[in-house]
C-alpha cells in the first residue's frame, strides 16, 4: 500500500490539544472503509510470518484498528486503558508525559503466560505509552513480538525506546 495515499488522509490540526502541537487526526481514514481495510491489510502483511496469540490496543485510538486487526487474525483483542477505567482486577503502570505523568492498566487475567502479543496504537511519539503497555504485557508473562502504529513522529525518536521490547516495529506513515 502506498503510504502517501494514507498520509493524504491525515488531517493536521494546529495547536491541538495545546498551543505548539500539530495533532495528527486519523478520523478521515476511519470514515473511509476502503482506506481502513488497506490499513488492516498492511498490518496483516507485515505480521504474516509471526505467531500471534493476541492484539493489545492502547486507549483510545489503539482500539479502533486494534479490534479490527484482532478480528481479521481471529485472535483476542486486549484493551489497555487509562487507570481507573477497567472494572475487574488490574495492574497499573505509570509513565512520564512532557507535562507530568499518566497511568495505564490491564486486567490481570487478560494475557496467558507465554502468549505472543502485538501492541498497537495509532501514533508513536516518544514511546512512553508503548513502553508502559510493554511493561504491563511482560508483567503478565506475555512476549511482545511486534509494535504497530499508523503514524510515527520520527523526529521524537520514540522507536529507540521500544527496541528493548521488540525489534519488530511497523509504522505506516512517518513524519
Go through each PLM region and give its residues.
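Active-site-facing substrate-recognition patch
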Residues: 1-52
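PRPP-dependent phosphoribosyltransferase catalytic core
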Residues: 6-8, 131-175
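Residue-level signature of catalytic and energy-coupling elements of molecular machines
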Residues: 20, 55, 77, 147
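Short glycine-rich phosphate-binding loop at a beta-alpha junction
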Residues: 52-59
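Conserved acidic residues
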Residues: 53, 115, 145
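Short Gly/Thr/Asp-enriched flexible loops that form oxyanion-binding sites at enzyme active sites
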Residues: 64-73
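Short, glycine/charge-rich flexible loops or terminal/linker lids adjacent to PRPP-binding catalytic cores
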Residues: 75-118
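Conserved G/P- and acidic residue-centered "switch" motifs that form tight phosphate/ATP-binding loops
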Residues: 122, 127
